[in-house]
Amino acid sequence: MAAPTEEDPRRDTSLMINERCNFPHNMLSEENINFIQDAVCNGDLGAVAALNSGLPMAPYMLEALLAVRVKHRLTKVRQTLEPVICYTISVAHLINGTRILRSATAKHATAWGPNDKHRAESGLRRIYRALNLEDNPFDLVEAVGDLDLSQGAYEGYVRHIYSLMKSLGHDVGHLSRSLDYSTMTVFNYLYESPLFTSQEAVTMYSRNLAGITKMSREPFETLSVVHRSKEPPEILNDMLFLLSVGRMIVLHQESLRALRKNLILTASALCSILYTAYTQVPETKSLFREVAHEAHALLSSRSPDTPNFRPFVACMLQFIKQIIAADVYTCPRYLTNQILAVTARMHGLEGAAMGHDDDLDIEVDPGNPYSAKYRMNNPYNDQNIFKCPRSLVHYVGDALFKKTMTQELLVSCTDQEATYQTYELPSVSELVGEGVAKRAHLTPDQLSHYLSVVSTPVEVVTDDIEDGEQEEDLFADVSVAPASPVRPIRGGGQRMANMRGARPYSTVQRGRRRHESEV
C-alpha cells in the first residue's frame, strides 16, 4: 500500500511501515524477519507492523489483536507456528513500546521545564486572584509534572481545572460537545483524553500524541507557547493535556511491566507446546534443548531489568523451521488428547477411556516378518504425525529428552463446583518407541533390545526397499500441487498502515475487510 500523499486526510492517522515490518533493529536476523514475512498472510502484515511498532495499549488488548494467520502452505504447523509468531510480535511490541515510553517521558519533561512551570504558576495565580480564591497553585503545578499519579488523584485535578474554567465562564462540558476527539487515541490506546475547550487544542494535542508513538524528535506544541498567550483557557487546556500525558505514562509503565511478566510466564507454556512437536520429530532434540534452556533463563532471572528475550525467540524460530522441514502435522491439543486416551486404555483407568472401550486396539502388520502388533490409536504410528529419526540410538528410548506431559480432565460437576483432575502422561516415550518400531519394521521388544545393546549410531532403513530399489507405490499420489506464487506486497522504501478504526470495537471501524492473500 502506497503512503498517503500530503493532501490525503489519512496521512494524519497512518503509521509508517518499514521493510522490516517494524521489527526492532538487533532483535531478529534478516533471515528470521524474511521467514516471518513469508509465513504470514499478506493481508495481515499491516497489522503485524502496527503491533510491532509498540502502539501503547493494555496487554490484554495486544493479545486480543494478535490474530495472525499463516499462509495455507503452512497449515500443517499452524498450531505451533502461530503462537511462536505471536510471541515474537509481543516481544517486538515490548521493545518498541519501551522506546516510546522513554520518548514520551522526555517530551513531557521538556514541555514542563522550569520556565514552563514558572509561566503556568504565574498564570494560575492571576486566575486565582481574579476568582478570589485563596488556594495555592503549587500543588496543581507539581501534579502536572508528577509521573506517579494514581487514577483518583488524576481525576481530582481534572475536576479542579474544570471548576476553574467554569468559574471563568467556560463550560467545558458544553464547549466540548461539538469537538471531534476521534484522533486522540488513534496512536495511543492508553490515553484518557480530558475535555478541552477548542478544536484547535484537540488537533494540536492529537499531533503531539502521534509524535510520541512515531518517536518524532519534535517537542510538544502547546497553545500558550504557539500563541505566546497568557489567556486562562489556553493555559488551563495545556495543563490538562500535560496532566493527562503524565497519567498516560503511568499507565504505559504498568502495561509494559505486565506484558513483560506475561511474556516470561508464556515462555513456559510455549515450551510445553513445542515439546509435543519435538516428540513428533525427535531429531530436533538439540534445538528443543536450547529452547528449554533459554525459557528457563527467562523464568529464573532475578534482574529488575527487562530480560533479553532475543535468544529465546531465535531458538524457537530455528526449531520451528526444522519442524516445517519434517513435513508433519503438529496439533498439540489433538496429540495430547490421543496420548491421554491411549494411556487410559493401557492402564485400565475406568471412566477415562473416552469411548475406546469397544474400539479395535491392536493391529497386526502382515507385511512384517515378525507378525508385529501395534496400537491402532497410537498417534506416533501415523507417518503424517511422526517423523522417524534416522539414528535411533541418539533420539529414541532413554535418549528422548524428558518432560512430564500432563492433561486436565473434568471428572465431576455439581451445581456448585466443577472438579478437574490432572493426569500425567508417562507413556510418551513408549508410544514414540512403538512409532519408531513400526517405521523400522521391528516389534517394540526388538527395538528395546536393539537400543540396549547398540551404542554406535547407525542409520536405520524405514522404507520398503529390496535389492536397492524402492517398492512400487500401491496408491495414487493425490497430493495437491503447490499453489502458484503470489506477488509480495512489500517492496522498496516504506509503506503506511491507517490506524483509524484499528482499535477493537472502534466506532469508526467502517468497511474493513480481511482479504485472503492466497487460495
Curated annotation (Swiss-Prot):
Q: Which UniProt keywords apply?
A: Host nucleus
Known role = Plays a role in the inhibition of host type I interferon production within the host nucleus. Targets specifically the NF-kappa-B-mediated interferon-beta transcription.
Task: Give the organism, scientific name.
Answer: Murid herpesvirus 1 (strain K181)
Does Nucleotide-binding show up as a keyword for this record? no
Q: Which portions of the chain have biased composition (kind: Basic residues)?
A: 510-519
Write out the ranges of the annotated region (Disordered).
485-519
Lipid biosynthesis listed as a keyword: no
Please give the Pfam families that the UniProt record associates with this protein: Herpes_pp85 (PF04637)
- Localization per record: Host nucleus
Q: Which gene encodes it?
A: M35
Q: Which domain of life is it from?
A: Viruses
Instruction: Extract one GO cellular component term from the record.
Output: host cell nucleus
Q: What is its main location?
A: host cell
- In Swiss-Prot or TrEMBL terms, this protein is called Protein M35
